[in-house]
Regions:
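Short secondary-structure boundary/hinge segments and terminal tails
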Residues: 36-37, 93, 188, 207-209
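A generic structural-conservation signal
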Residues: 28, 84, 154, 179, ...
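Phosphate-coordinating loops and pocket residues in cytosolic domains that bind phosphorylated ligands
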Residues: 45, 163, 192, 201-202
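Short, solvent-exposed turn/loop segments enriched in Gly/Ser/Thr/Pro and often Arg
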Residues: 32, 158, 203-206
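GST-like fold's C-terminal all-alpha helical module
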Residues: 75, 97, 101-194
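Terminal-tail/helix-coil boundary detector
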Residues: 196-212
Length: 212
């Protein structure tokens, strides 16, 4: 059993989607970041960086882990699913694109959300800088998905799970997904997965998955 500390953000949804995909039982502990609940002492014990998501593996001596990418890798290895260790190319492509998301998509899209959605008009320079970088990243993704069905290649993996929740906020980024036909194809296929639909709703929200 996994204890999941999360909120309905892209990083939080990665882990709930992953848990649904691998069929692993989990308890949900909502951490409302709008109310600064991530700074409560009990959560600090699980996540020293005061950020969601975080997990505690009750079956592994209450082993705790934070950082969404690390959690995805842990759950993939624990379950033996969504990361192909028998195919070295597929395995390292998965890690490669997971790191691409962690180092590029997450930080850059997050800055777009901050300057374009929440602080629009306060810094034309920041809006242009981060929006331009977001479009570049979408173009990189579009090219990759024009060559392969999934981000890693032939197989659905944690790389797809890590990236998809960030693209699901294309409206926050003022991105027209129709400009990226391969991303749109992949995004729609992902949105149709039952596990993605279930994981999207964690914790307790009724937000619809945005349609491109």
């Amino acid at each position: 059993m996994i204890d999941l500390y999360t909120w309905h953000t892209p990083n939080g949804r990665k882990v709930s989607i992953m848990l649904e995909e691998i069929g692993m039982a989990y308890n949900v502990f909502p951490i409302n970041i709008a109310k600064d609940e991530q700074f409560q002492p009990h959560f600090l014990e699980v996540s020293p960086n005061n950020r969601i998501p975080a997990i505690v593996d009750k079956e592994n001596n209450n082993y705790s882990l934070f950082e969404s990418g690390a959690i995805l890798m842990y759950l993939a290895e624990k379950s033996g699913k969504l990361i192909n260790k028998s195919n070295s190319d597929e395995y390292y492509r998965t890690i490669e694109w997971l790191m691409w998301q962690m180092g590029g998509v997450g930080p850059m899209f997050g800055q777009v959300h901050h300057f374009v959605k929440y602080n629009k008009g306060k810094s034309a320079y920041a809006e242009e800088r981060y929006s331009k970088e977001a479009r570049r990243l979408y173009a990189v993704m579009d090219k990759r998905l024009g060559q392969h069905q999934y981000i890693s290649g032939k197989e659905y993996s944690i790389a797809d799970i890590s990236i998809w929740p960030w693209t699901a906020r294309f409206d926050w980024q003022e991105i027209d997904l129709s400009e990226y036909k391969n991303v749109t194809r992949w995004y729609t296929e992902m949105a149709d997965r039952p596990a993605v639909q279930k994981g999207w709703l964690v914790p307790q929200n009724d937000q619809l998955i945005p349609s491109p």
